[in-house]
Curated annotation (Swiss-Prot):
Subunit structure: The eukaryotic PSI reaction center is composed of at least 11 subunits.
Organism expressing this protein natively: Daucus carota
Name of the protein in its database record: Photosystem I iron-sulfur center
Recorded GO CC terms: chloroplast thylakoid membrane; photosystem I
Localization of this protein: Plastid, Chloroplast thylakoid membrane
Membrane topology annotation: Peripheral membrane protein
Domain of life: Eukaryota
Biological process according to GO: photosynthetic electron transport in photosystem I
Residues involved in [4Fe-4S] cluster 1 binding: C11, C14, C17, C58
Annotated ranges, domain 4Fe-4S ferredoxin-type: 2-31, 39-68
Role of this protein: Apoprotein for the two 4Fe-4S centers FA and FB of photosystem I (PSI); essential for photochemical activity. FB is the terminal electron acceptor of PSI, donating electrons to ferredoxin. The C-terminus interacts with PsaA/B/D and helps assemble the protein into the PSI complex. Required for binding of PsaD and PsaE to PSI. PSI is a plastocyanin-ferredoxin oxidoreductase, converting photonic excitation into a charge separation, which transfers an electron from the donor P700 chlorophyll pair to the spectroscopically characterized acceptors A0, A1, FX, FA and FB in turn.
């Protein structure tokens, strides 16, 4: 099952998330919005196993990469009352 992987523009182009991903979901692409001139991209989300190693590796204060697991979304929907 694929998960949703969102890359935010707070990415500093450090490549930590790309190196942490065991299934090569992420890659770096050119981007002029940061000093490193690159940003993480998630072209292969169907390969995401939901381990969230990319999130753990992100050094920014506000995580630049977020993984949303489909079962987390379903579970949290049942908590509203």
């Amino acid at each position: 099952m694929s998960h949703s992987v969102k890359i935010y523009d707070t990415c500093i182009g450090c490549t930590q998330c790309v190196r942490a991903c065991p299934t090569d979901v992420l890659e770096m692409i050119p981007w002029d919005g940061c000093k490193a001139k690159q940003i993480a991209s998630a072209p292969r989300t169907e390969d995401c196993v939901g381990c969230k190693r990319c999130e753990s590796a992100c050094p920014t204060d506000f995580l630049s990469v977020r993984v949303s697991l489909w079962n987390e979304t379903t579970r949290s929907m049942g908590l509203a009352y």
